[in-house]
Amino acid sequence: MPKTYEITNKIRTLRFFANEMSQQTLAELTGVSRQTINAIELGKYTPSLDLAYKIAHVFGVLIDEVFEYKIANEIVK
């Protein structure tokens, strides 16, 4: 039976601590639409590796500080 996985993120929290940055501002800084940022935050869309790095760069953090990959009940870092 294949393991199920989930990618979660801390984008909303990072935006809050970045002077309450709007989704629109983050979208402009990363070259995507506000709707894309919203879908990523809600877990409805998994970003490409390139976009994930761009998001991390905007906040000045490592990619694994933004995104977390979970397999079933374990956390993979």
Show which residues each predicted segment covers.
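Residues within the helices of the helix-turn-helix
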Residues: 12-13, 24, 49, 53
